[in-house]
Structure formats: C-alpha cells, structure tokens
C-alpha cells in the first residue's frame, strides 16, 4: 500500500492520468491525497472532476480556492452560470453536475492522519495555529459548507478582509479561515495575508514572509503537504512540502509518496503552454532547502467568478 499526495490538477485530465500511470496507482491498495484546485484553467475540468469523484473511495481531497469558486458558481442562477468560462460551464451544465458538486461540497479544508504523521492543506496556516487548532477551524467551515445554509456562506466568502483574529464571528470569521486555508502565500508576523504578492520569495513587499517561514510561528507536530503556490516550484522546507509545480502553466504535475521514510517524488510534464498569462507566475525549477532523497522524477529539473476578490484568485 502506498499513500501519494498530488499537487494542483486544475483541470488537466490527461496529465493526471499519465501521473497515475507513472506511480502505478492501484486503487485496490493505494490511497491518493489531492491538495485541492481540482478544476479550472486546464480545459478538462469536467473530466478531471469525474475522475477524482470516481476515486472517492480511494482518495482524500482538500478544497482549493478554485474548487470553492466552482461551488459558488454552481449555487448561482442559470443565467449567472452561463457567464463563466467554458471549462467550468461544462461542469455546471453537465447531467451529473449535482452529484459532482454535492460530493465536492462535502470535502475538507484540512486533512490529518496522525498515525502517518501528515497534514494536508491547500495553501497555508496562520502563524499561531497548531495543527489541532487548524483542524478545529477547518471543521467550523466544513460544517457550514455541508449544512443547509451553504449558499449563504458561498455568497459571503469573497473578500480580502478581515485578517484572522480569534474573536471574529459570523461570515467574517468564516472568510478569514477560508482565506488562510485556500489563498495564503505571504503574511505578516501577525498573520495578515498579502493576496497581491504571488511570486517567488525575495519578490515580496517588505515585512512579508512565506507563511511557513514567518517569525514567531508555532512549531507543528506534523509534516505538512500543500499546493496552491506554483511559483515556488517543488519546495521542501521547515516541515512543509509544497507540491504545486504548475502543471497547468507548462510546468509539471507532482506526486509525493507520504508513507516512506525517504520521500519519493514522481513528476510528469504539464500542459505544453509556452507563456502563462501576465497575471500568473511561471513556476521555478524545483526548489529544495533540505536534501531530498529517493527521488524518482520523470522529468528533471482564475476563472470568471464574482468581481470581488476571493477564493478564485491565484
């Protein structure tokens, strides 16, 4: 039995299939951890969502910002839905849309396996959050998403403010939690997210730090695997394993085996895109701050959503 974490798929169905073949995925005994952003931009979002849904008995999914945006689109009127990009429109107009979206809405913001020693999130954690606190706050929002009032949450989750504070309540609290789990890259030592800074470390504004290097952060008792930040490339540092390697931008799709002492990395080439949009960052070559052993690499080396800022960005 093997446990594999896989980076952001973003609607790259063919590439996902190639990666599953490369790791010799066997649903009878293996488990997949998907780091979120299953859909959008890759052109095959419906096929990708159907694939992951078909593997639901053999996989774990955490929600990314693009997944939440898809859920928000699915909760709108049909007239509003027709304004979204063709990749997501195919999902909300599909015959099996209700089954797919209802299943997606039941997924987590954070997944923890303490026996294995890992936590999976999409983007980041507040500097002062222990893994136990992160689980608790994730469950708060998951209960809202899975409950009867989820449409109100999806309408109110957009916006960059407020920053996280334990005293927050209502939709302000839910929005702050969602932004940390699904949009975070850089933050201040007090945990204020900088949503406009998306490049590689060293390009950010003064006073900002990668969320996993911010001064004063708590020590965490689990290794963390995440996606979201394609500009980082493959990065392993401070107990964090960032594996969004920009498959949708012409980078690679990455799988990381979690159940071995020596981390094993497997990659396949991503979409053959020469230049990402100007609003996106081209992924760097894999970046590791600690030596990675046991590598097995095949290669070396938002969608139209509400006009307000929110989970679709990045």
Curated annotation (Swiss-Prot):
Catalytic activity, reaction form: P(1),P(4)-bis(5'-adenosyl) tetraphosphate + H2O = 2 ADP + 2 H(+)
Superkingdom of origin: Bacteria
Biased composition (Low complexity): 297-314
Segments crossing the lipid bilayer: none
Keyword Hydrolase: yes
Gene Ontology terms for molecular function: bis(5'-nucleosyl)-tetraphosphatase (symmetrical) activity
Entry keyword set: Hydrolase
Record flagged with keyword Hydrolase: yes
Region (Disordered): 267-314
Its EC number(s): 3.6.1.41
InterPro entries linked to this entry: ApaH, Calcineurin-like_PHP_ApaH, Metallo-depent_PP-like, Ser/Thr-sp_prot-phosphatase
CDD domains: MPP_ApaH
The family this protein is said to belong to: Belongs to the Ap4A hydrolase family.
PANTHER family: CYTOCHROME C5, PTHR40942
Physiological role: Hydrolyzes diadenosine 5',5'''-P1,P4-tetraphosphate to yield ADP.
Protein name: Bis(5'-nucleosyl)-tetraphosphatase, symmetrical
Gene name linked to the record: apaH
């Amino acid at each position: 039995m093997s446990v594999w974490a896989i980076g952001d798929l973003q609607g790259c169905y063919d590439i996902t299939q190639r990666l599953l073949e490369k790791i010799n995925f066997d649903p009878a005994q293996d488990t997949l951890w998907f780091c979120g952003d299953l859909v959008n931009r890759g052109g095959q979002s419906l096929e990708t969502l159907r694939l992951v849904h078909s593997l639901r008995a053999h996989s774990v999914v955490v929600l990314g910002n693009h997944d939440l945006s898809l859920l928000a689109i699915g909760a709108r009127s049909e007239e509003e839905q027709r304004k979204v990009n063709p990749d997501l429109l195919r999902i909300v107009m599909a015959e099996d849309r209700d089954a797919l979206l209802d299943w997606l809405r039941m997924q987590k913001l954070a997944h923890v396996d303490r026996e294995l020693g890992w936590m999976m999130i999409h983007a980041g954690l507040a500097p002062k959050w222990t893994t136990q606190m992160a689980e608790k706050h994730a469950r708060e929002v998951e209960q809202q998403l899975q409950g009867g009032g989820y449409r109100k949450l999806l309408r109110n989750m957009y916006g960059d403010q407020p920053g996280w504070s334990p005293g927050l309540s209502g939709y302000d609290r839910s929005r702050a939690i969602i932004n940390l789990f699904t949009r975070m890259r850089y933050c201040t030592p007090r945990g204020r997210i900088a949503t406009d800074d998306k490049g590689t470390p060293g390009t950010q504004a003064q006073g900002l730090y990668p969320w996993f290097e911010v001064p004063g952060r708590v020590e965490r008792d689990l290794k963390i695997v995440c996606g979201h930040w394609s500009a980082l490339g493959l990065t392993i540092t401070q107990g964090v394993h960032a594996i969004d390697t920009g498959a949708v931008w012409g980078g690679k799709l990455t799988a990381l085996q979690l159940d071995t002492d020596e981390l094993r990395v497997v990659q396949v080439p991503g979409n053959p895109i020469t230049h990402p949009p100007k609003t996106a960052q081209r992924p760097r070559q894999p970046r590791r701050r600690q030596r990675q052993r046991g590598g097995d690499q095949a290669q070396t080396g938002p969608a139209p959503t509400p006009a307000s800022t929110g989970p679709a960005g990045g």
